Swiss-Prot record:
Positions contributing to substrate binding: 8, 40, 72, 86
Protein's name in the database: Phosphopantetheine adenylyltransferase
Protein residues bound to ATP: 8-9, 16, 87-89, 97, 122-128
Superkingdom of the organism of origin: Bacteria
Keywords associated with the record: ATP-binding, Coenzyme A biosynthesis, Cytoplasm, Magnesium, Nucleotide-binding, Nucleotidyltransferase, Transferase
Gene that this sequence comes from: coaD
Gene Ontology CC terms: cytoplasm
Subunit structure, interactors included: Homohexamer.
UniProt organism field: Picosynechococcus sp. (strain ATCC 27264 / PCC 7002 / PR-6) (Agmenellum quadruplicatum)
E.C. code: 2.7.7.3
Biological process, per Gene Ontology: coenzyme A biosynthetic process
CDD domains: PPAT (cd02163)
Function description: Reversibly transfers an adenylyl group from ATP to 4'-phosphopantetheine, yielding dephospho-CoA (dPCoA) and pyrophosphate.
Compartments (UniProt record): Cytoplasm
Length: 178
């Protein structure tokens, strides 16, 4: 079965990549469908986002990256995909995604939505959070693939923070009178 994982991916995060990698194991093919949404103002062009995702998914044999405009259900029908893959971080995501799944079902009866709970380490992560951290010069190296982190630092004209390893202090020894 073919699954579509739609989104704006501006930028792709390690949370997105986690869903893609898990989808790769579950489905015959996963199409990461990068949405061209005229109502959004992405920092990266559509072509740049597609290239970023292709670079960080090249190790996944069943993943294809493409862009689309219009309704996700129309795109799924064109690509013979029967599943929309969605990640859920928190309860509010579920409410929004469930409503969207019902709406998509009214648009095309043959589409199903499969929800994957995000891994714990990514439950707080969103593209908006990543952009905010990068904008103010914080490190996003642990939140996005390396190529995307470099692109973010260039976009915001900040230098990647130099993170030094933590200082290990010797454990104090108890004072023993002798």
């Amino acid at each position: 079965m073919i699954a579509i994982y739609p989104g704006s991916f501006d930028p792709i995060t390690l949370g997105h990549l986690d869903i893609i990698e898990r989808g790769d194991r579950l489905f015959e093919k996963v199409i990461v469908a990068v949405l061209c949404n005229p109502s959004k103002s992405p920092i990266f062009s559509l072509e740049k986002r597609v290239a970023q995702i292709r670079r960080c998914t090249q190790h996944l044999p069943n993943v294809e990256v493409a862009s689309f405009t219009g309704l996700t259900t129309d795109y799924a029908r064109q690509r013979n995909a029967g599943v929309l893959l969605r990640g859920l971080r928190v309860l509010s995501d579920f409410e929004k995604e469930l409503q969207m799944a019902h709406t998509n079902k009214t648009l095309w009866d043959n589409i199903e939505t499969v929800f994957l709970a995000t891994s714990n380490e990514y439950s707080f992560l969103s593209s908006s959070v990543v952009k905010e951290i990068a904008k103010f010069g914080g490190s996003v190296d642990h939140l996005v693939p390396d190529n995307v982190a470099e692109d973010l630092y260039q976009w915001y004209k900040v230098h990647p923070p130099q993170v030094s390893p933590p200082t290990i202090m010797p454990t104090p020894q108890p004072f023993i009178e002798g």
